Amino acid sequence: MKKIALIIALAMLIGLSVNTSADANEKYRIVWSHYTGWEPWQFIMESGIMDKWASKYNCQVEIILVNDYIESINMYTAGQFDGCTMTNMDALAIPAIGGIDSTALIIGDFSNGNDGIVLLNGDSVKDLKGRKLRIVELSVSHYLLTRALEMNGMTERDLTLINTSDADIAGLFITESERDPKAAVCTWNPPLMQVRNVKGANLVFDSSKIPGEIIDSLVVRSDLPDNAKKALVGAWFEAMSIMSSRSKEGQNAIKAMAKFAGGTLREFQAQLKTTAMFYKAQEAADFARSAKIKETMEYVRTFSFDHGLYGENAPDKDVVGIEFADGSVIGDKGNVKLRFPAKYMQMAADGDL
């Protein structure tokens, strides 16, 4: 009997070692799209930083660029990737509402002027009344517009929205500005930078007025193994350390990112100024624990429900739960699909990765 027990124990041990080995060779795929705060992912991949951290945690990580932002999120939601760069609003509206339990593993930055409203012959949000405004509907620009109107005692009924793709929005505004003295647009960088340069154009509201509300993160499947999460967080904050240093290595990293982004160094540096990057892991962890993120997600889920992003059959905005770093939940505690933990960012801050 003891002999049988020994054989069973050995078999279990062998099986465990085989599974561990398989996990060690597991390959994870991360997708990102072009945006100032996400350009570091290409640097992380090309510099070898990702390979170094993946090797440390016995896994492989592939980082892939997909130019179409929404398509990248759809691919993640469909199971083609283990993680994806996206905003807090899109993380709720697409994967979370779609039933994919997702975690904002790395809070990289928040928009601090990268999104804005520009119009001709006007100097305030109230001058939008009665106008037609070009915008990517149901995007973070739409959220920004809603907040701007709310803060100025207005609603969307006070103007007409013209749904426009982000690829066309700058060109169309520039063309319209030549014949329409009331042309107006709401967009994000780099198109925002282009429309602001139009003669007579005024920026009347931008995301610096709602700091901490348009959040850019690396979102991963909540069941992504611990070693992969640690490798990703370690690689990201090593890149942040390089990027924020005044060293030649840091300068070269930023030059490389500007090149990846398809713009000049000056343009990229200007966009960085309107992006509140969390260069230090402690800052990111503190933000994840802040009351601000709870307040923001309340705004975001209200906007998402009011604009039909929960689907026509959703009875209310509580059908999906959102969990925060302190364990508190807004929405259905039995159906948590979006999480904002501080755990791994804090580990990076404490030097525990």
Language model segments and positions:
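Sec/Tat signal peptide C-region and signal peptidase I cleavage site
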Residues: 18-24
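Sec-exported extracytoplasmic/periplasmic mature domains
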Residues: 46, 55, 77-78, 96, ...
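Short, glycine-/small- and polar/acidic-enriched structural segments
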Residues: 25-173, 178-189, 204-206, 212, ...
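Bacterial N-terminal signal peptides
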Residues: 7-16
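Pocket-lining segment of extracytoplasmic ligand-binding domains
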Residues: 162, 168-266
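Positively charged n-region of N-terminal signal peptides that target proteins for export
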Residues: 1-5
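Secondary-structure end/capping motifs
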Residues: 226-314
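Conserved C-terminal helix/tail region of periplasmic/extracytoplasmic solute-binding proteins
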Residues: 300-353
